[in-house]
Amino acid sequence: MLSINNKLKNLKLSTVKNLYNKSSSISIILVNNNNNNNNNNNNNNNNNNNNNNNNNNFISLSTTNLFNQKLCIESYKKVNYCKKKGGGNKNNDDNDNEKNEKNEKKVKNEKKEKNEKNDGNEKVEIVEDNDLIVPLSKELLQFDKPSNKRKDWPLNSEVVIYPSNSVNFIGTTGPINLGFQFITRLVPNASGKTFLGFFLCKDAYRNNNNQIGRTIDSIHNVGVLAQVTLSPSGIYHFETIKRIRIKEVQNGQFPFIASIEPLSNDERELKDPRIAELMTKINVLSLEYRKLYPDVYTINSVDFENQIEVIDNPDYYLAAVINYYGLNYPDECQKILETQSVVKRLEMLYHMILNEQPLLALQQKIAKDLDDKTTAYKNKLLLTEQLKKLKALLGNETDEKEKTIEKYQNKLSELTLISESSKKVIQDEIYKISTIDPSSSEYSALKNYLEWLTNLPWGIYSADYFDLKHSKMVLDSDHYGLEDIKQRILEFISVGHIKGTVQGKILCFIGPPGTGKTSIAKSIAKALKKEFFRFSVGGLFDESEIKGHRRTYVGSMPGKIIQALKITQTSNPVILIDEIDKIGKRNHGDPSSALLEVLDPEQNVSFVDHYLDTPYDLSKVLFICTANSGQDIPAALSDRMEIIRLPGYVEEEQIEIVKNFIIPKTFIDCGIKLDQLSISDDVIKQIVKFYSREVGIRELEKLIEKIMRKTALKLVNGTAERVDLTLDNLEQYLGIPSYTSDRYYDVTPIGVVNGLAYTKKGGATLYIESTSEEIQKPLSSLPPSQQQQNQLEPSIKTTGNLGDVMSESSTIAYTFAKNFLYELDPNNTFFSNHNIHLHSPQGNIPKDGPSAGVTMVTSLLSLALNEPVQNNLGMTGEVTITGKVITIGGVKEKTIAAKRSGLTSVIFPINNRINFEELPTYIKNDIDVTYANDYKDVFEVAFPNKKYLLNNLKTF
C-alpha cells in the first residue's frame, strides 16, 4: 500500500512530483529542499524555514496510463487519482508496453541525477502498493490512514456562482472574462486554489443581460466546479473538475456565494459494461457520420477519431463528444449534467447525436450544392477561355477587347464636331483600355467612361425655329393669361430671328404653386421646337448631382446637366431647373455654387463636369428656373437670371381656366361624355369663389375631378343617365363651401385695420388689431419719492407670430404714432397712460415683411383717437420714423386679395403707381386707389371725420 510516513510532514517541501505508468503502481515522490543553507545551520533557522516552507507544499499527478496526450492532456495532469496496477486497457499493444518501460527508466534516471546534483539535499522515498487508490491533496500531508476520501476542497466549501448561457462539462477549459464584481469575490481556499461554480441560466433569463443571474431562481441548481487561474498576461482561465449542486445561498446580493456539495459517480456503476458499450456505439456512430457527411466534418476529424478511442473516463468523454459535434442545446445538455447515472448520461448523449442526423444531412446538402456550383462555375470559366483561344487560333472571331476598342474608335470617328482637347482625351482612354486586362475592375470603369464620352452630342445642335405665329399659337393654346411671360418669349424669338441664332438664356419664373411655371417652360420648348429636360434641385445637398462624381469613386457618374445632354442628344435643349429656391446648403458642399458655374454665361462656355473632366459648351442651352419666392434664391444666382414673376390668377382668370382648360381635360381623363354632364357658368363661379382660395389652379382641378368621380358613380350605378350641376345640388358633390369671406368684420371696429400682404401662395388680407390697458397710478398716500418709483412706464406688446422685420416695424409705428398724435392733439395723453397690445390673427402662421408699417400706425391712432377706420379700406406700405411711406412689392397680388375680400378702396405708396397702372383692366376695375407720399395722406383717407386735426401738424 502506498502510504505517506509521518516524517513527510516535517520535510521542507517546495515541489512534489508523482510520476507513474500503467504497468506498475510505483510512485516516485521527489522531495526538493529549496533551502540553500548548509545542514549545519542552527536549529532556530531550521525551524523558521520549516514554518515558511510548509505553506508552499503541493502535489501534481500525471495519469498518462488513462488518456492519450493528444486530447485534454493538460486537464488530466491535474486529476488526483491513479489506478491499480493493470487497471488500464487490457488490449494495450506491445508499443504501449515499450513506452511504459522507457518511462520507468526515465524516471529512475531523473531520480539519480537529482540525488547527485543536490548532494544529498534531496530526499527520495519509493513506496509501492497494488491495492488502493491514494487521495492526493493538501490534506494528504495531515493523515496517515490511506482510507481517507479525496478532498480537494471541504464538502461544505463555499464558491462564487457564475451564471452562464451554456453548459460546461468536466474537462472543459478556456479563457473567461470576469467582471470586477466577480474578481473581488474570488478568494483562494485553504489549499491556495481559486474556484468558481458554473451554473446554466434558465431559458427565460438566458438572453437578457439585465436579468442574467440576478436572482438565484434564474439559474439551475446543478453545475460544475471550475478552478480559476490567472495567466502572466492577465487573462483568467478556467478548468472544470467536478459536478456540484447548490446546497444553500450564503448571501442575497449578486454575485451570489453558495455552499455546494459534490455529485460523484457511483464507483460500482463505473464497472458497468454498458458504459464501454455505449462509448463504443457513440464512436462507431461518429465514424459513420464522418463517412456519410464528409463535407461537414473535415477539420481535425482524424485527431478526434484517435482521441475518442483512448478516452475511458465518461465525464471527459462527454465533454469531448459534445464539443466536437457542437451540440448547442442548453436545456438538453443541462439534463445530461443533472443526471446522476453515468449510463443514462451516455444514453442521452447517444440519442442526442442520433437526432443530429437530419441537421447533418441538411448541412451536407448545402455544402455539396455550394461545391457543385463552384465546380460548375470553374468548368464554365475554363471552357469559355478554351473556346476563346480556339477561335482566336482559327481566326473565326476577334477578341472581345479588340471589338470594344474598334467600337469606340468608330464612334470617335463619327464625332466630327468635337473639340481637339476632348478628342485627345478619348484617344488616350482608348489606348489605356487596350493595355488593361478585361477582367480587372479598372477595365469596366474605363469602359463606362468611354461610353459617356462617345455618346454625348458633341457639337450637335437642333435647328432654331423662329416662327412668331406658331410660337404665339402654342403659348395661347396651353395657357390663359400670363401675358408678360408670353411677351418675353416672343421678344426672345424675335432677337434670334434677327441674329440668325439663339444664344442661351437663363429665365427664372417666380410665383405661387399652381400658377403654371413648369407647364409654361414645356410650352416654350414646344414653341421653339427644342428638346425638353426637367430636374428638381429642391432639398439637394450634394453638389455632385450638378457637377458629377469624380471617377475615383465606385459607381461614379456625371451630373444632371451632362445626363440631360445625353438623353436629349442635342447641345441646345431647354433645361428646366425646378424649385431653385429650395436648394440645400451645407458646410461640406454648396450646390448653389456649383449651379452658378452652370448658369453663368461667362463660365458655362467651358463647363467641366467632375466625371468627364473635359470642357463642354453649355452656352446654347436655354435654362429656365422656377421658384415660389425670390427671397430664398441665393443672391449670386438671382443676379445672373432674368426674373419673371407669375402673380397668380384673379377670379375672372380662374373661371376662364376652369371653363376652357380644366373641364375639357377632366372629361377626357374620366371618360365622361359631354352629354352626360353639364356645368353652368354660375356653378363654376361659385366653385372659384367659395371652394378655393389659392391663386393657382391645382385645388380647382381637384374639385372638378371630385365632381367627375361622383358623376361617374351615378352613371355606373344607374341612378342617373345625365347629371346637371346647379347651384342647388352643388353641395351634394362638393359639400359645404370651405370659404365664405376673407373679411372678419363687416363694420370695422376701433383699433382694427385691414392690411394687405404678399405670401408664397399669393396675396392675402392681414388684419392688425390693437387694444389698450390703462396704467394703474400709485396711491396718493405714498410719499412723492415712492410714487415716482412705483410709476409704471407705458409699453407695447406684440403677438401673432410676427417676424423680426414686423417686430421692428411695430416699434417704429409705436414711436411715430406717439409723436404724430402729440402734434395732432397735444391734450391727448392716451399713449402716456396706457399699455398697448398689438396683435395679428392666425398666430399659427408666421408673418414677416416690410409692408405693414402704415397699417400698424393706423391701428394705434384709431385706438388713441377712439375713431374706427373707414369701412372697405385696405392698405399696405412701410412707414419711416419720420412718416415717409416707402415702396412695397406684390401690388398685383395684393390688389387681387383686396378684390377677393370685397374691399373697394386701397392705399398704395406713391412709388407703386406704375405697378398698379400696368395691371389689366379687369383687375383694376371697382378699386379706388389712393397713393400716399407720407402718412398724413393715409390719415386723411382712413379717418375722414378727423381730417381737421391735420391743420395742427407742423413737423409731419
UniProtKB/Swiss-Prot annotation:
InterPro entries: AAA+_ATPase, ATPase_AAA_core, Lon_bac/euk-typ, Lon_lid, Lon_proteolytic, Lon_Prtase, Lon_prtase_N, Lonm_euk
Compositionally biased residues, Basic and acidic residues: 91-123
Domain Lon N-terminal, first and last residues per copy: 159-357
GO molecular function: ATP binding; ATP hydrolysis activity; ATP-dependent peptidase activity; sequence-specific DNA binding; serine-type endopeptidase activity; single-stranded DNA binding
Binding locations of ATP: G511, P512, P513, G514, T515, G516, K517, T518
UniProt keyword Protease, yes or no: yes
PROSITE patterns linked: LON_N (PS51787), LON_PROTEOLYTIC (PS51786), LON_SER (PS01046)
Subcellular location: Mitochondrion matrix
Enzymatic class: hydrolase
Residue segments, region Disordered: 37-57, 83-123, 777-800
Keywords, alphabetical: ATP-binding, DNA-binding, Hydrolase, Mitochondrion, Nucleotide-binding, Protease, Serine protease
Hydrolase listed as a keyword: yes
Compositional bias (Low complexity): 777-795
EC number: 3.4.21.53
Gene Ontology terms describing biological process: cellular response to oxidative stress; chaperone-mediated protein complex assembly; mitochondrion organization; oxidation-dependent protein catabolic process; protein quality control for misfolded or incompletely synthesized proteins
GO cellular component annotations of the record: mitochondrial matrix
Active site per the UniProt annotation: S851, K894
Additional information: This protein may be expected to contain an N-terminal transit peptide but none has been predicted.
PANTHER family linked to this entry: LON PROTEASE, LON PROTEASE HOMOLOG, MITOCHONDRIAL 1
HAMAP family named among the record's database cross-references: lonm_euk (MF_03120)
Entry protein name: Lon protease homolog, mitochondrial 1
Source lineage: Eukaryota, Amoebozoa, Evosea, Eumycetozoa, Dictyostelia
